Amino acid sequence: MSPSMSIEALDQPVKPVVFRPLTLRRRIKNSVATTFFFTSFVVALIPLVWLLWVVIARGWFAVTRSGWWTHSLRGVLPEQFAGGVYHALYGTLVQAGVAAVLAVPLGLMTAVYLVEYGTGRMSRVTTFTVDVLAGVPSIVAALFVFSLWIATLGFQQSAFAVALALVLLMLPVVVRAGEEMLRLVPDELREASYALGVPKWKTIVRIVAPIAMPGIVSGILLSIARVVGETAPVLVLVGYSHSINLDVFHGNMASLPLLIYTELTNPEHAGFLRVWGAALTLIIVVATINLAAAMIRFVATRRRRLPL
């Protein structure tokens, strides 16, 4: 073909591509697949909606009652529906907070090691250990802390022992969240910092960590939400109390899961109301933490999209 002919061919308008309509067989397959996935979604959604409806319907009266959030059960008889869950809510937040104080620094340092320094056998062993720890049941973590902290070292049951068990459950979540966020930081930023003569540790602290911090904070909040409802550690490692205990290292301390378990043995109607009220309170706490994590992710995403 001559050059002139090729130029003329290029000057011709491009004909629109004509798509053939889907055959009946393909339309049927698409309809079947759409119906299957929608049905699966509805089937998975029904238990969740039903659970929330039952808990809200049965616990709403308790959580909206005066004094529920500001009073404890000190001096309240089993047949009386009085007081509130202030002592249990305080214990839940304190135990999760102490666990976070211990687990977050250790988890973040482990994540930094795996992403920035980890090579060879040590890195593989650490990754394998974190994976195994992520699948450990809460009762196993509680029994381990009981055998080491209480039976072997001689410390008494306390909220701090519960926090140690929660650390074992939080640690793999924090490590994975930190590792994923650190890997999302572009290597070009690290290389540019190294080219300017900045040491590696200062590059991590001044450049890598601030960029990954919103995602890391979100992962930390999700790890806290994962452990606030754990029941096995509080059943094994601490006793129940009807009043507030400010000492983390000594004495019994109530929590929302422990309050639910204790009130289940109360045959009075007041116990029934407290059980469902505590369950709804626990759901509200977990939902609030998850909402905070989602808001942090949303704000961080919007800041990245803003023009410079």
From Swiss-Prot:
Part of the binding-protein-dependent transport system for phosphate; probably responsible for the translocation of the substrate across the membrane. The lineage of its organism: Bacteria, Bacillati, Actinomycetota, Actinomycetes, Mycobacteriales. It comes from Mycobacterium tuberculosis (strain ATCC 25618 / H37Rv). InterPro entries: MetI-like, MetI-like_sf, Phosphate_PstA, Phosphate_transprt_permease. Pfam families: BPD_transp_1 (PF00528). Signal peptide: none annotated. One of its GO terms (molecular function) is phosphate transmembrane transporter activity. It is found in: Cell membrane. The complex is composed of two ATP-binding proteins (PstB), two transmembrane proteins (PstC and PstA) and a solute-binding protein (PstS). GO terms for biological process: biological process involved in interaction with host; phosphate ion transmembrane transport. This is Phosphate transport system permease protein PstA 1. Residues 89-297 form the ABC transmembrane type-1 domain. Its main location: membrane. Induction: 4-fold by phosphate starvation, part of the pstS3-pstC2-pstA1 operon.
